[in-house]
């Protein structure tokens, strides 16, 4: 072979190898870029109107030469709210490393480096494309983004902590997807959480919201405690915490009480295990020992293999349909038996129905709950939405060594009016089909105990009863007041405003008394003077007098002696001593009283003195006036009053002026005889004729002396 030919072939082979290397060098970046397109996205959870998105490896350093591009949406007609919880991109020029938001009409960004980035963006659209691109860099966490619709202006990011807020009470909206975001929490749902804990992550731990759904939270900030105990709940591990100045708690719907059930008859299991202790005695791990509050070993299944053909289960009968919002579980609780269930699913049913499996609200798949990680510590899982059923089964999926469970159900009774405790979907787009019998119902089962709206009856009946009671009370009060007013002895209020004295209505009438009335002169401490009166008490009894003002006086039990009006011919039926306007239907005004007198009977002698100085001789008759130097003798056997000053011939003088026939008493028939005897000294003691008792009545205001027989009988 010619040497030149051999050299040409070698050159051709070398050129071919170089061309192949060049092609590989050119195609490698293209292939790498194709593989990494969209591979720069990290944590991503989206729901109907909220979600969370991060760069890859967040909060670690994001990889080189990656691209993350996603489109996020909220319901049409709503505006989109974006909040950047964290943005750390190394590039300063945004040439190869940046974060960009693009909508159909606007562009927001790019953002990178140390640029001032708004914490919140309110977009005029319901859809936006998020693009994150990275080049060659050394450090940088990337970004954390949360979003929600404009229905939730109080949106916060997954990185918000309670220490960021000063208010003692506030409400915020947590987006979906905060459970797996890096960050610690300390505390539990009973004692509260340390104020350095992430708010949304703590809300998931407490069972207030579901991670895949997000939701509204209400926070109460309180004084801190010395130690915070951490537990595992709803897939979130809470750590033990130290003393802090403040802590926070969540307000719940009140349906978080322990549901009681009896160990005998209300708990069943697919099988149970019997062990032998060190002393050779058998230990029965029966279903009745599955209550969390009971001491001793738990329930354990009879088969310890990991390949159970029929599923093992623990069934609880609550006695009636109840709302179940959560479950607490532990393992064997025995240190020498390290048994516990690592994961499980829930089945439930009601009377005469088939068993249903609890499924997730988003993907409509059988929901597997995270169980215990040791035999001792309790773990809590919440059902969002709650289970409404009478029978519940815990079906273990994975376990350690042997299935062993202690269980406590959390929930409340179903009553009319607690419809607010029922979780509702925010949209119909994620409704779950329930046509098949073996599918779960992700909302409470409609029943006679669970109302689907505001129960009008529970509102209307109390209102009607309240109105009836109010009207009944008003009627009773009006009737009582009317009766009291009608039976009042004081007349109407209108009558009391006339500035006149009114006669009080007596509730009863006194009967005539034939007894003697005795009065005493207490003021002058004189010897007892006896004034014997036999008359109708109704004529002498004087009504109480009440003025229209604040002054109230009590009158004497004897009628006043001022009869000027009578002597003047004025009728007592027409008016009193006061010119007071009369109204139709009104009673006669009472006569005015003399100067105030004591409540008991006024002494007769004092009244005589008053009459003697008050009434003139023209009044028609005179009354006797006692002399200071004379006394009535009660021991002499007679009664001889001495003539008073101003008397002509005797103690009594008959009326001189003739009065009309319609006087208050009958006229004497034997006037001439009395007139003849008036000049005789013996006229001091007027004679009493038996025959005149029928034709003559003594004036009401005159005194009738007693005869010797009456005085003797009295003494």
Swiss-Prot record:
Cytoplasmic side: 481-715
Topology class, membrane: Single-pass type I membrane protein
Location(s) in or outside the cell: Membrane
MF GO annotations: signaling receptor activity
Modified residues (Phosphothreonine): 614
Region (Disordered): 278-312, 619-702
Pfam families to which the protein is assigned, alphabetical: CUB, F5_F8_type_C, LCCL
PROSITE patterns per UniProt: CUB (PS01180), FA58C_1 (PS01285), FA58C_3 (PS50022), LCCL (PS50820)
Domain of life: Eukaryota
Alphabetic keyword roster: Disulfide bond, Glycoprotein, Membrane, Phosphoprotein, Signal, Transmembrane, Transmembrane helix
LCCL domain: residues covered: 152-248
Residues in CUB domain copies: 41-150
Membrane-spanning residues: 460-480
Sites bearing Phosphoserine, chain numbering: 513
Glycosylation sites: 64, 124, 277, 351, 418, 455
Residue ranges annotated as Extracellular topological domain: 35-459
Full protein name: Discoidin, CUB and LCCL domain-containing protein 1
Cysteine disulfide links: 41-68, 94-112, 158-174, 178-200
Taxonomy of the source species: Eukaryota, Metazoa, Chordata, Craniata, Vertebrata
GO annotation, cellular component aspect: plasma membrane
Ranges of biased composition (kind: Polar residues): 295-307
InterPro entries listed in its UniProt record: CUB_dom (IPR000859), FA58C (IPR000421), Galactose-bd-like_sf (IPR008979), LCCL (IPR004043), LCCL_sf (IPR036609), Neuropilin_MCO_CoagFactor (IPR050633), Sperma_CUB_dom_sf (IPR035914)
Signal peptide: 1-34
Domain called F5/8 type C: residue spans: 248-412
Organism: Homo sapiens
